């Protein structure tokens, strides 16, 4: 995905001299040296491929970039320190501070008092830093959850974009059939075989079909714009959008609800955040609240994994049915083609069979994408994003 005007700080000066009038409109989160030249080339080639979406979200999504900047500001304000288990460390430092204050109050000489005062303040500062570090860890988890949620949303949007394209093809084929139906109705009316009302009905059906196409094209463009903006392009940009990869049927066979539920519980962002809140609670009442939240999270995760698996199976059945329907409509079209060549059916009957075949083919492609999306949704649940 190339952005000639998206580059890291290291390349900015040279780019200005080479591309006057093309200011950088967005910078990647990662410094230029953080990826290889080949990786940057892939992300900046003005081509959107499905496998690039997570990296594009990380580097160029506005929300993710803003969150990264906020985290950097937090680190600059507080300084980032690696910590022990948060609640244990805070407790240790506070106990040490209390002991130091007691020693200060009971000191028999000035030197001991001074040392105790320094120790008390140092431990209080360390406890405060631990609280800040706990806040940072929670903030980092929240930001990562947001980032992955946007990536999931972008993947689904790309899938929808192609589903709509197939649906548009089906509508356009149907529009052609409806146009032929109008011509047929007019011809039959001139022969006294159809009424004026029949012609009007055919014309109305054609108008409705054309309106559906206009609405579908608008929906496709809205989806396209939303997709590319999520990934750092502007609405008016026209990157090439490559097809979504083929469904890996082996993934379905490899799914194990019990094992995957354990993985999902370990990875779930909401559960991790609630667990942190439980660990850091300073009252029994709060601990009880978050204990219930943690248990509820685990139950919801188990339900989500099972539901996700069932939706994969349903999508697979839907795809299999669509494949069979294509076979049926192909046979029907072959038969209609022979009959049409022999003159035993009308052109409109032949076009109806042809239209049914195209609709079946497009429906199969849509069902294929629905299956792909069901598998991806399941995978996201296992990776901690519900």
Which role fits each region the language model picked out?
Residues 30-50, 242, 294, 301, ...:
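Acidic, low-complexity, intrinsically disordered peripheral segments
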Residues 217-259, 375-386:
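Short, solvent-exposed, mixed-charge loop/turn linkers that connect secondary-structure elements
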Residues 28-156:
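Short flexible linkers and secondary-structure junctions
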Residues 67, 74, 128, 166-215, ...:
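Charged, solvent-exposed structural "stalk/scaffold" segments
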Residues 47-50, 54-64, 108-134, 234-295, ...:
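Amphipathic alpha-helical coiled-coil scaffold segments and their short linker/junction regions
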Residues 75, 82, 89, 96, ...:
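Coiled-coil heptad-register positions
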Residues 1-27:
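Sec-dependent N-terminal signal peptides of Gram-positive bacterial secreted proteins and lipoproteins
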């Amino acid at each position: 995905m190339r952005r000639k005007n998206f580059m890291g700080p290291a390349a900015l000066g040279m780019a200005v001299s080479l591309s006057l009038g093309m200011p950088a409109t967005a910078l990647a989160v990662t410094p230029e040296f953080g990826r290889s030249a080949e990786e940057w080339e892939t992300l900046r080639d003005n081509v959107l491929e499905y496998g690039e979406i997570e990296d594009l979200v990380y580097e160029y999504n506005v929300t993710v970039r803003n969150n990264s900047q906020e985290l950097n500001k937090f680190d600059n304000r507080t300084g980032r320190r690696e910590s022990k288990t948060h609640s244990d460390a805070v407790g240790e430092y506070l106990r040490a501070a209390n002991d130091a204050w007691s020693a200060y109050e009971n000191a028999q000489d000035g030197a001991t008092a001074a040392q105790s005062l320094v120790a008390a303040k140092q431990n209080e500062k360390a406890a405060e830093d631990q609280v800040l570090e706990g806040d940072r860890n929670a903030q980092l988890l929240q930001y990562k959850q947001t980032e992955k949620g946007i990536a999931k949303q972008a993947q689904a949007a790309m899938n929808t974009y192609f589903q709509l394209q197939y649906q548009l093809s089906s509508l356009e084929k149907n529009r052609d059939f409806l146009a032929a139906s109008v011509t047929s109705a007019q011809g039959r009316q001139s022969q006294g075989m159809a009424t004026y009302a029949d012609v009007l009905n055919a014309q109305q059906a054609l108008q409705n079909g054309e309106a559906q196409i206009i609405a579908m094209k608008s929906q496709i463009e809205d989806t396209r714009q939303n997709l590319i903006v999520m990934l750092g392009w502007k609405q008016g940009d026209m990157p090439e959008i490559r097809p979504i990869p083929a469904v890996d049927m082996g993934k379905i066979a490899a799914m194990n609800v019990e094992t995957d539920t354990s993985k999902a519980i370990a990875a779930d962002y909401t559960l991790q955040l609630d667990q942190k809140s439980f660990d850091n609670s300073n009252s029994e009442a709060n601990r009880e609240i978050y204990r219930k939240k943690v248990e509820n999270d685990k139950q919801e995760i188990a339900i989500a994994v099972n539901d996700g698996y069932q939706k994969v199976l349903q999508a697979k059945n839907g795809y299999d049915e669509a494949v069979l329907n294509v076979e049926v409509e192909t046979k029907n079209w072959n038969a209609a083609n022979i009959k049409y060549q022999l003159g035993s059916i009308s052109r409109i009957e032949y076009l109806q069979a042809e239209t049914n075949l195209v609709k079946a083919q497009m429906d199969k492609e849509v069902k294929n994408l629905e299956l792909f999306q069901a598998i991806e949704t399941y995978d996201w649940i296992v990776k901690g994003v519900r």
